[in-house]
Amino acid sequence: MRLPVLAAAVFGLALIASPIAAKKKEALVPPPAPIDMTIDLDPSHDPENVLVLDLSNGGRVDIRLKPQWAPAHVERIKMLAGQGFYNGVIFHRVIEGFMAQTGDPTGTGQSGSPLPDLKAEFNAAPHVRGTVSMARTNDVDSANSQFFIMFYPRFALDNKYTNFGRVISGMDTVDAIVRGEPPQNPTKVVQASLASANKPRPVLAAAPAALTAPSIDELNASKSN
C-alpha cells in the first residue's frame, strides 16, 4: 500500500503525497462527468451523510459528505469513522492559507488504514474554502484514509484530488487548528462520528492550572510570621 501524504506544488506550496516516489506514473483520467454542486447546509437533513469532528480545541465541525461525487471515498470515511479510526488522530500537516491534513494514526503523514487504497473518483466539484478532499501519493489510485480541509480556494487541485465533501458548520473551529508540519502542539480529532449516531460532545480534560509566583504581600506576610 502506498502511504498517502498531501504534498503537491500549488503556488509555491508543496502538495504531493509521500516521501517515497510512486513507481507508477499518473494515469490519464477522463474528464469528470457533470455533477450536482448543491450543498445542504442543514446537518439534520440526511444525517447519515454528515461527518462530525469534535476537535481538541473544543470546537465541532460538521461536514456534508457527497456520495454523488465520490461514493467509494464517502463510504470509506463513514466506515473508518464508525470504527473509531480517526479518534485521537492529529492534524499532522497544517499550512497557513492552504489546508489542514489529518487521517494518519502514526501522525507522520506516511501511513493510513489497513484497508486497500481506493481508485480515484475525481469530479468537477471545486476546491473552495471548506472543501474536504482525499490526500494521496503521486499514484492517483492511492487515497486511503488521510484527508484535508481547505482554508482557502486552490482550484489547481481540481480533478487531481478526490473532493468528497464540504464543511457546513464549524469553519471557525477549522481555522483554529494549530499550524505546522507537524505542529509542536497539534490539534487532534477527539471524536469522529456520523450525525445519525447523535453522539454527545466528548468532555475534554481541563488544562492544568497556571503556576504563579507569590506576591510581595504574601512574601512579607510569611516573613512576619
Regions found by a protein language model. Give the residues of each.
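Cyclophilin-like peptidyl-prolyl cis-trans isomerases
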Residues: 2-7, 16-225
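Metal-dependent nucleotide-binding catalytic modules
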Residues: 10-11
